[in-house]
Amino acid sequence: MNKNIIFSFTVLTLFVIFVQVTGVIGNLQQRRQMNQTWCSRPLLTHKQTGKCVIEDCESKCRQKWKGNGTQATCRNQCNCHFRCPWIQGQP
């Protein structure tokens, strides 16, 4: 009788450890998928001057890609940097 209790307790302990370990691995895989993937797209420069004006560039970026944490940079042209929902598996 005592051996049966020890065996049952051992099996139960191993099962609980297995469930906890597989749950941790599942959480790590989900966290890995949640990493942000950034995209960059060029936009047209200022029509009159042909130069990139950062205020206009930021405004156009926010209008085109709303709610995606957009950022704009001006070098030779206006570039928008935003989170890519289609790469992250979001609609």
UniProtKB/Swiss-Prot annotation:
Protein keywords: Antimicrobial, Disulfide bond, Fungicide, Glycoprotein, Plant defense, Secreted, Signal
GO-annotated cellular components: extracellular region
Signal sequence extent: 1-26
Any one biological process term the GO annotation gives: defense response to fungus
InterPro entries in the cross-refs: DEFL
The keyword Disulfide bond appears for this protein: yes
Protein's cellular compartments: Secreted
Main location: secreted
Disulphide bonds in the chain: 39-84, 52-74, 57-78, 61-80
Family under the similarity heading: Belongs to the DEFL family.
Listed name of the protein: Putative defensin-like protein 145
Organism (species): Arabidopsis thaliana (Mouse-ear cress)
Source lineage: Eukaryota, Viridiplantae, Streptophyta, Embryophyta, Tracheophyta
Gene: LCR2
